[in-house]
Amino acid sequence: MLLIHFILMHKNIFKYPNLSIKNYEDSFTKDQADRWLESSLDELNWLEGEIKLFGKDIKIPRLQCWYADEGCNYKYSGKMLERNNWHPALLEIKNKIEVITSQKYNSVLANFYRNGTDSMGWHSDDESMLSKDSAIASVSLGQERPLCFKHKNEDISFS
């Protein structure tokens, strides 16, 4: 599965404090999604990244790549990601998402889950370089997987 983080939301689907999630189903045709998936798998600059965890460099269980506007950098878990210039398929997705959401996006962190063991752990997109009210768009192409949310301070989780 390829997860492209941009966030597509249309109606609030969860009613929790400090959480606004909207879901735009059927925003793209199957042909568009198939074309973007094939192009992304074949042409994006996938890297096997590492994060710093308890002072040690650990390989992350997925491939990823960072595409962004010039001058837009991203660092998490002690690692600065290598910025790539926009790929045409990602730019096409970005432009469609901007029309749907009426939001502007300046970057994408694409994650490729190669098999059933690749994953993303619980995390918060709270890096200091992100503004508090940043919109995050998430597009999933390929095999369907659950997208789960967990409250940081309360015992609430859902997918």
Regions inferred by a protein language model and the residue ranges of each:
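Non-heme Fe(II) oxygenase metal-center motifs and adjacent flexible, charged/small-residue loops
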Residues: L2-S159
